[in-house]
Amino acid sequence: MREYMKNRILLIMAWALTMVTLVGCDDSTAGYTQVVQCASVSLEGDEYVILPLGGTYDEPGYAAKLGEKDITNEVKVKSELNTGMYGTYAITYRVTTSEGYVAEAKRYVVIADPTEPVGVYFVDAENSYRVPGSDKVSYKPGFKVVVLPNGDGTYRVSDFLGGWYEYGAGYGSDCALAGNIAVAADGKIEMLDSFVKYWRNSADEMIDGVCDIAAGTISWQIVYSDMDFYVKMTKN
């Protein structure tokens, strides 16, 4: 199954690259093809920045290129960040070429309430593992999960599988099992929904989901695709 998934991903990536090239970088007519240089914007640092109320945001940096030319000074940065109010704020970095092509990137700054499970969590590789059948396969260090507030008392989880496919297999975020949770006063976690964008399927269930706000830890067992993922993680 893993080989089948990998092959499908490689095929769709090749198709997507072709489409981007045709749509985003070429200006074709019946008699000729004029190649137009593409602009790109890249971010330094993390995509998500977690700050306490009243904290100071230090811009990690960004860069933009038009082909091989540096056009960072042409980037327009738009932000409505308010560190004095809890919430999630987007910072948009955008550049527009003379041909009218637009490239942009976004960073999200979360002003986190310390009484909520919001933050960037790193998987405890020594105590996290996947069980397919009778085998037990441990996680590798460095996998992370982002938990963000939805603003209605529920939370968005970037990957219930703790980065198993996103980081471990290198398949990217489209193969993360993202979804939403509710956390009870006693710390018990309820999985409200889940979905893998690439495979278009969901988890069967969550077992023993627990959040310890004081300790900054989350743990759960996820049953997905006839496998069990035991994930323990600690807030950064």
Locate predicted features.
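Low-complexity "stalk/linker" and mucin-like segments enriched in Ser/Thr/Pro/Ala/Gly
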Residues: 65-72, 191, 201
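Serine/threonine-rich, repeat-prone extracellular segments and beta-strand-based repeat modules
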Residues: 68-103, 107, 112
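Ser/Thr/Gly/Pro-rich, low-complexity flexible regions
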Residues: 115-236
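Bacterial Sec-dependent N-terminal signal peptides
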Residues: 1-7, 17-46
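Residue-level recognition of well-ordered beta-strand positions that form the cores
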Residues: 63-65, 94, 108-110, 122, ...
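Generic detection of short hydrophobic beta-strand segments and adjacent strand-loop junctions
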Residues: 49-51, 107-109, 179, 231-233
